[in-house]
Amino acid sequence: MRKIIVGSRSSKLAMTQTKWVIEQLKQAGAPYEFEIKNIITKGDRILDVTLSKVGGKGLFVKEIEQQMIDEDIDFAVHSMKDLPSELPTGLIIGATPSRVDARDALITTTGGGLDSLPEGAIVGTSSLRRGSQLLKLRPDLKIESIRGNIDTRLEKLKTGPFDGILLAAAGLQRMGWSEDIVSEYISTDDMIPAVGQGILAIECRANDQEVRDLLNLIHDQMTEKVAFAERSFLAAIEGSCHVPVGGFATINEDLSTTLVGFLGSVDGQQILLERETSLDPMQLGQTVATRLLDAGGREILASLPDDL
């Protein structure tokens, strides 16, 4: 019987997600033995610089993907929001389990929500998307970059200058911490999530049919549809960590997909939103992206500083 080697970052969240996937596969009847291989990525090593300055989304996956290409590991579990819109040749997303909470979560030092933050309060986030939309909601706030895994950011909230921090709700919930520490969940109407937020992407080699069949045991087609829509939108925008961009898709009763796309300026002064519904998720993402770009998005992208 083949042993399946699963690549994972070594953070608590990454390991929790990887172990969850393995457990789901076992519960679905997978007859394999599994072994987790920890892989340190560039994004894990560089913690004192904003993501966009050191390479953006691919920082957390390149080393893992190379080990997959080299056949040192068989598949890897990622937070989909960390995956670039284009994958290396020969690799595919083999499965997307059901999406969990896509919202952003605010954690404050006082336990109060967004409205309770005093004027000029400092909120930590490494996401230009979150910063832009937060400043739209509260122009008086000050945004400061904060890096590191969940534990590190929570510690910085206690010891640093921050009055609050913004994190993905999904990660906190997967760690089992959300009920104790989340001050407010920000509605997706007020803050469009990152593309793929709340979705696990299980990446594997396209030519490894055995692993593809295995991963299909926990694949959710509705989640795949919204992921297609959001990722095709991101690819058309050419979005990265350099761009305040977000996209959130939902499935309707008639199985059509509705996508809301967001593109904004770093200071939150310009916020562009487009909404469309289609039966074709891939085309939907491209349509929403084109409309955003035509509505002033190109000018926003051109005006973004190079040193973000």
UniProtKB/Swiss-Prot annotation:
EC top class named in words: transferase
- Matching Gene3D superfamilies, A to Z? Periplasmic binding protein-like II, Porphobilinogen deaminase, C-terminal domain
What GO biological process, any one, is recorded here? Answer: protoporphyrinogen IX biosynthetic process
Q: What pathway annotation does it carry? A: Porphyrin-containing compound metabolism; protoporphyrin-IX biosynthesis; coproporphyrinogen-III from 5-aminolevulinate: step 2/4
Q: Does the keyword Membrane apply?
A: no
The protein's matches in CDD domains, at most eight in alphabetical order, are given as: PBP2_EcHMBS_like
Q: What is the cofactor note?
A: Binds 1 dipyrromethane group covalently.
- TM segment ranges: none
> What residues bear S-(dipyrrolylmethanemethyl)cysteine in this entry?
C241
- For this protein, what is the EC number? 2.5.1.61
**Known cofactor(s):** dipyrromethane
Which InterPro entries does this chain map to? HemC (IPR000860), Porphobilin_deaminase_cofac_BS (IPR022419), Porphobilin_deaminase_N (IPR022417), Porphobilinogen_deaminase_C (IPR022418), Porphobilinogen_deaminase_C_sf (IPR036803)
The family database entries (PANTHER family) matched by this protein are listed as: PORPHOBILINOGEN DEAMINASE
More about this protein: The porphobilinogen subunits are added to the dipyrromethane group.
Tell me how this protein assembles. Monomer.
The family assignment reads: Belongs to the HMBS family.
- The protein depicted here goes by the name Porphobilinogen deaminase
Q: Lineage from the top down? A: Bacteria, Bacillati, Bacillota, Bacilli, Bacillales
